A protein has these predicted regions:
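Short, Lys/Arg-enriched N-terminal segment that forms or immediately precedes the first helix
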Residues: 18-33
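Helix-turn-helix DNA-binding motif, specifically the short coil turn and the N-cap/start of the second
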Residues: 53, 62-67
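Short alpha-helical "packing" element that flanks the helix-turn-helix/winged-helix DNA-binding module
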Residues: 43-44
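DNA major-groove recognition helix of helix-turn-helix
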Residues: 72, 79
Length: 109
């Protein structure tokens, strides 16, 4: 059986997150989990933490601006769901490669 569609492109991530698990306080027992992929984490870091434009952030991740926008929207939705429902957030997985080469993130390719 063959796969239909275009193969997925690797997303470029600059670094592993320092913390890969967040849990709400005041919630007894083990809360449900929301999984945030590494590319979603990187998109949120670039757009919301560093304040880059979508064009510049997309260039940094080596994806199109439309793909970046989709990744960012999905990541924000996961975080909003986790916060609204008291879920823990685990950062793992995704289709990514860690690129440690220095690059000026304000210049889009």
């Amino acid at each position: 059986m063959s796969l239909i569609g275009r193969p997925k492109k690797y997303r470029m991530i600059r670094q592993d997150p320092k913390v890969s698990f967040f849990s709400p306080r005041g919630r007894p027992g083990r809360p449900d989990q929301a999984i945030l992929t590494m590319d979603e984490f990187e998109a949120i870091r670039l757009a919301d933490d560093l304040g880059l434009s979508q064009k510049a952030a997309a260039g940094s991740m080596h994806v199109s601006q439309q793909t970046f926008s989709r990744i960012l929207k999905k990541g924000r939705k996961i975080i909003a769901d986790a916060m609204s429902h008291g879920k823990s957030i685990k950062i793992r997985g995704g289709f990514y490669v860690i690129n440690t080469q220095p690059e000026n993130p304000t210049q889009a390719k």
